[in-house]
């Protein structure tokens, strides 16, 4: 007789579908909310990932995908989505001056005002737990007084003409300063229906909107009479001449527009960007190659030494040599920054005492680059040493015994047996190390911050900058504003370069070993 296993309440289909339905409603609400806020990419990403997840976990036929989905979702969320966003930004003028939408930039301009009409001296007088606002016309000497009010939010105060000011003690400057934000939200309406607002800590003035918006989108400056029209090529309201051509004046803030491949064109045509870009690209490749070669060479030699049978105290040497790998890299980098200090660093003190020289590690381009490679070799060799120590165990001792019978020495054994047998399994890891060092932002940012700086460039660039740190400086340290669009274009080029170099390296090594 078959035994029917009773399900617990938390295993019931009704509960499962109820939870899935609630999650679906929640996701739908979030997607609509993102769409309404204009976050279209986030809305699409949330819709795709959540829909796929609900389908996989609700359908028994996709049971095997439940183990793969978290990894795929993580890759999509943290790798593919940022990549798509970066590429999308690269085709816009998104920057510190062009962050807003057209509607928001237009509203900011329409909210601006200028001082027009009379200026009145004002005072605050206590009225129990509330206050009264008093205005005095400096030309006629007339006084105007409001009813009692409390601070908080936007409000209009109707003022009436009065013969004398209240007899209480007038609020001092400290009280006015403390309530300045609340006073800025007050509009005082005079008996003739004219309106004045706070213009300084002691005065209220009449104001008018600085710009008037026409039905055709034309913006007119009410002070100067200059007319502006939105220029969707540059993302600014730009002045227009009498003949309808564009003038030189642009109104800030601008708005974000799609500009096509202009950012990519700037990289290759603007000499202020082109020269440092290609120079930095060459240095980035050289830095990555030298780092891989030196870390592998040092790590392999040290691995062979600590595996030497005749060496005593091998365990102690292994621990000491692995220490640079155990210490967090950012701590080691900052320590080396102090050691290489040109005036007080221990390295220059030793070089001065022994050889009478004090290299300019941070101001000379060549010595700065040498310092970067030295520090990165120190940080990277323990990883390669650990890999080589494991791979050396796989080399049969018979090969070394046979070479000893032929009279081969240690150097011949290393170059004829050890090196060829280690290089093949190390190749994929060397390619990964090359890709990592191609984007080694932390080292450059903490050690040299890209310096020494290059002269004659339109973007901030230094002699030790890698492409990734150069991109960061364009995005966040630009003197003329943070140019996120240009930085995204360079980041896209870096992605394509690293991908192309990795493919070329993999194909080259495959052809070599086949």
Swiss-Prot record:
MF-aspect GO terms: ABC-type maltose transporter activity
GO biological process: maltodextrin transmembrane transport
Domain (ABC transmembrane type-1) ranges: 281-505
Residue ranges that the UniProt entry lists as topological domain Periplasmic: 37-39, 93-283, 342-369, 436-483
GO cellular component, one term: maltose transport complex
Membrane topology: Multi-pass membrane protein
Localization annotation: Cell inner membrane
Ranges per topology, Cytoplasmic: 1-16, 58-69, 307-318, 393-412, 507-514
Keywords, sorted A to Z: Cell inner membrane, Cell membrane, Membrane, Sugar transport, Transmembrane, Transmembrane helix, Transport
InterPro entries assigned: MalF_N (IPR035277), MalF_N_TM (IPR048464), MalF_P2 (IPR029345), MalF_P2_sf (IPR047103), MetI-like (IPR000515), MetI-like_sf (IPR035906)
Family, as annotated: Belongs to the binding-protein-dependent transport system permease family. MalFG subfamily.
Function recorded in the entry: Part of the ABC transporter complex MalEFGK involved in maltose/maltodextrin import. Probably responsible for the translocation of the substrate across the membrane.
Subunit architecture: The complex is composed of two ATP-binding proteins (MalK), two transmembrane proteins (MalG and MalF) and a solute-binding protein (MalE).
PANTHER family for the chain: MALTOSE/MALTODEXTRIN TRANSPORT SYSTEM PERMEASE PROTEIN MALF, MALTOSE_MALTODEXTRIN TRANSPORT SYSTEM PERMEASE PROTEIN MALF
Name of the protein described by the UniProt record: Maltose/maltodextrin transport system permease protein MalF
Gene coding for it: malF
